[in-house]
Structure formats: C-alpha cells, structure tokens
Amino acid sequence: MRKQRSGHIVSISSSAGLAAGFDFVSAYAASKFGLEGWMESLQAEVAPFGIHTTIVNPGFFRTELLTEQSTDYAESSIADYDDRRGPLVEYWKSQNGRQSGDPAKLARALVTVANQNPPPRRFIAGADAIAGAEQKIADLRAQIEANRELSTALAFD
C-alpha cells in the first residue's frame, strides 16, 4: 500500500471496544481496546502515504457468536462472582438468534463505507452500538466536567 500510495485498512472491532462495561467481558474488551488503539495510531502513520483506516464497531448482529459451538463459558472459580455469573450466562444463551442486527445489511453497509471518499475513520454499526457510543460520550463529558477545575490547574505556575 505504501508503494502504491493508496489503500484502505478496515478492522472489525466491537461495540465493546468503544464502550465496555459489561460483566465478565474484560479480556474481550481489552483485546478490542488494543485493536482500536493500534488502528488509531496506525492511521496517523499511514495517512501520509494515502492509506486510510476504518475501525468498525458493530453492535449485536445475528451471527454465530452466541451459538453453543462458538461460545464457551468458563466454569466459575471464584464464588464471589457466582450470583452474577449464572443469570448473565443464561441471558447470553437466551439472546442467541435474537440479536437485532442483520449481518447481510452490515456487509452491504461495509461496502458502502469502504467506497466513501474519504472513508470514515470509524463506523459505528447498529442502533445499539450508536446508543452505547452516545452513552460513552456523555459519561466522558460528565467525568471531564466533574474535575475540570482540578485538571486544568496542573500546569507549572
């Protein structure tokens, strides 16, 4: 891509890579946050060569993610988590086949996004993913405002 001075790198992340906060998905979310940090840094490195990057944050799409063949739930090893773990595992199992996102529509949307000029640096896919992103933005704004005075008073006098 550098040689031809053009290209487009698309990474599929997750809504959990943008706004985590679900019980028992810390390792998954960490992997997605890592992917996103890498992509955001990569964007600055490759943009001078005409290479674009896009992070895709899909919400819940009706894929094989929650099927028994695709998902293994770890056995509980810490009793402190048992009261939350059981109901959550049952919830996830109940959602298989009920996810609101249509993967065929997502595929068509990704083709549209890939053909935009310039393509977006981020595509948040699905109404649930947008709602999560908007909540994350609101949470960040509230955290900034809660400590704005303290935070902005840290420069040398």
Predicted regions and their residues:
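SDR active-site lid
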Residues: P48-P119
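Short-chain dehydrogenase/reductase
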Residues: A109, R122-G132
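Catalytic tyrosine of NAD(P)H-dependent dehydrogenase/reductases that use a Tyr as the general acid/base
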Residues: Y28
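Active-site helix of classical SDR
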Residues: S31
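Rossmann-fold scaffold of SDR-type NAD(P)-dependent oxidoreductases
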Residues: S11
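Residue(s) in the substrate-gating loop at a strand-loop-helix junction
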Residues: S14
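A short helix-coil junction within the Rossmann-fold of NAD(P)-dependent oxidoreductases
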Residues: M1-R5, A19
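Active-site-adjacent segment of SDR/Rossmann-fold oxidoreductases
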Residues: A19-A20, S41-I51
